[in-house]
Every structure is written in C-alpha cells, then in structure tokens.
C-alpha cells in the first residue's frame, strides 16, 4: 500500500523476540550499555553528512533513526496496544460539511507538493518516472505535464495564486526542471512580482542518508563508486527537507498555511477544494486520505488508534507480531489504508519540528541491501528510512477521511501503466484522470516479458478495452493489437516461447491459449 517503503528493522527480524532468542549480532547492538557503545560511531556519520552539506534537520532525522537501529527497535505494534477505528468522516460528509464559499482565498494560502524523487528503476527506467507518457494519444502528456496543467487550470478557474512545489531528488531535478522550463514556463514566473527576473521556487530537494555497514554499524564505504554509500531516506524526509531547506519558513512568510502532499505517480491525487475547506474549517494539524481495504489489501498496512492516547497510528505488515497476523489481515476489523494523500497545516508542522530538533519522531523503516544494489557479492548494509504518513501519530487532533478508490491510482508497475492507458481511465477537460470503469481493473503482466517499460511498449500496438474488465492476466509473450476488448475476468496464455499476436475481438470471462488451435 502507499506509504510502505520496506521492512521495519529486518536486521532484527521485523518481529518480536525474547532476549534469549536474540542472535549474537543483535545482542551486540541491543541494550543500554551496547547502545552507548555502538553510538560511538555516530561522529563518523555526522562528519560525513556535514561534509556533503546536509542540513541540521537532515542530520537530526538520521541520528534519530540510527539511535533506534542501535537500540534494536523493531517497530512492532502489538494488537493489544491499539484499537480499531470504528468510524471516520466520509468523503461525501467532508465535502458537504462546510459553508459554500469562494475557494480563492484558501487556495492563495495553499501549496501543492508532489513527491518526485523516483526514477522508475523497477520498470527499467533511468529517468524521472513522472516524465512517462500517461496516454498513448495525440497529446502525449506525461505525469508531470498533467500535474502542471492541473495547477494552471485551478489558478485560472479560481483566480488564485496556488503554489506548486516538487520534492525532487538529485536524480530527477535536472530533467524535470528542464521539462517545466520548456513546456510550462509560466509556473516558474514570480507570483508576487511579474517584473522580477528570478524564477519562482518550484522545487526543493530531498536529502540523502548514509548507508550503514551491517557488521559494524559504521558508515559504509564503496571506493569504486562513492555514490553507492548513500540512499534516499524515504518520503518521511519530506519534513526535514522542507524545514532544513528553508522552504517551510519561506512558505509561512509568504502566507501559505496549508499543504496538499501526494506522490507524483498517483494520478488520482488532485487538489479537491471541498477537502481543503474541510481541513481548514476544522483547523486540523494533519489529515490523511484513506480508502477501505479489500481482500487484495490484506497484506498492506492499515491505520488504527493507539490505546494509550487515542492518536492515529499507521501499522505496516512488518510492524505486526506473528501472533497478531490474523488481526492484521482482518479487513472487517482494521478497515482503512493510507493513500499517501496528506494535508498538513504548516504552523502545526513547524511547532512539532522545533519541538523535536527539526525531525519528527517517525517509526524507523530499515532495509537490508547490498551496498551496490546491482552486485549481490558486495557487503550488506542497512538503509534507514521513514514514511511520511506515519507523521499522523505526531499530532493531537489529527484526522482521517475516507475517500473513493478513484483518489488512489498509483503507477508502480507496467501493469498499472497498462491499465491507466486503457479506456478504463480518461482525462478530463481539467486534466484530471477519471476512472470510467466501475472498479479499477486488476492487471497482471508476465514479468519476464512486460516488467520493463521498453519491453511492454514493444509488445503493445494498441491498448485493449478494459472498461468492463475486472481482471486481466497475461502469461508469455503476447502482442496486443487494435480492436481487442476484454470483459469480466480474462487470461491470455502463450504456451510457446515465441511472440504470439492476440487476434482482435471481444473476450468475455475467457481463458485464451495461444497459438489458437482453431
């Protein structure tokens, strides 16, 4: 689900252990005395981060994560410590709970932030995923184009200077800023002084975190390619990146009070003015958009309430003890998951950051990797990350609102993109992506032939109709051409090693084998 970056401290198994069951390595780095001992390595990390020009806020956030790693903090959330959420505000109630009024004054105090640091490496891309074309049509708009067009349309419709920011990475900044300058230069024009030659700030950069050597908990070294010594710190870095870059203070100085934050690859995540009014009218410090879990969401995380103080908490799969697995998977008990569409009150955020030395106390997500991800023979390291949705537990009076599934349409795989490019989705005159099907069709493509974007593109001459299809599974190397319509639950299986074309036609609840015997 959105917000799940990886296992929570897999270095300690991601599960509960008694002291007697700790391994030698875990024992070496657990307990108060060992914590002091292992934290002796901290000055090396601080020196390394300062030499790279990272902010005090970024360093403080990493130090908090490193301290948890050294303490053996597994992040387990026991069922006995939480309560299921019985009722939340619905999307319809939120949209009708405020007085009808002009949205322009609120929009002038709002900024749209898109997390845009991903390269889409899981799809074989070496450029920003947001530069992928959404529809195979004449417009050829990318994710970033639609985001920019949505902002421009909202400014025009409401006569308001809605702010727009990308949280880029060092890997995506150059390409995406070049694209904006070439195709959407008006977004970089100053909002307050049209005569100024300075560009309007539309980006801030995510930080980077040093990888931790597994065996010693020292800073990891990779002499042949020092860039492998660093990793993205997860989207929980939003908060120290905003604070440490000065962007948070600049927004507040400019009169901006509200943020709407979402992933750039979630085409369902558009700024809804009624949700903005609901958020502002109730003076919530933080609001999360959630969806109802279905059977396909059983393994994904859910939100709940902490029994001790009633605050919302995110619990991911790796934070669940084995004994609680049945409770975790019970979607009638734990009903909601995080979409990663978040609303943040900047004044409350700044207060929380300053209270915690520039870094919110977020649960640690610890990924075990090879220092060179392309070489399994290289030493093991820990990558320390956090998730931005976990910040919901940092605020009193935080809120969650149940939104329709149409506001959660992420593109993580080529199957997701295949679905989005079909007629199950359309693009409106306001450049929003609209679900035309009753429910999003599930698309499972053979990873041997479709996992990489270029491979999928080479096998699709025309995307099939999926508007009345609930599930499509493709096995083998199948070429899709014009005139193919799927309905209900369908599968296509190429039984040979050679590419096989699927003939045009309508297929309803069909299990198709290629080559056809007829």
Residue ranges and their predicted role:
Residues 1, 118, 480:
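Conserved S/T- and glycine-rich ATP-binding loop of Class I adenylate-forming
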Residues 4-108, 277-518:
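Left-handed beta-helix
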Residues 115, 166-170, 207, 262-264, ...:
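Short His-Asn-centered micro-motif
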Residues 116-117, 264, 346, 414:
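Residues immediately flanking
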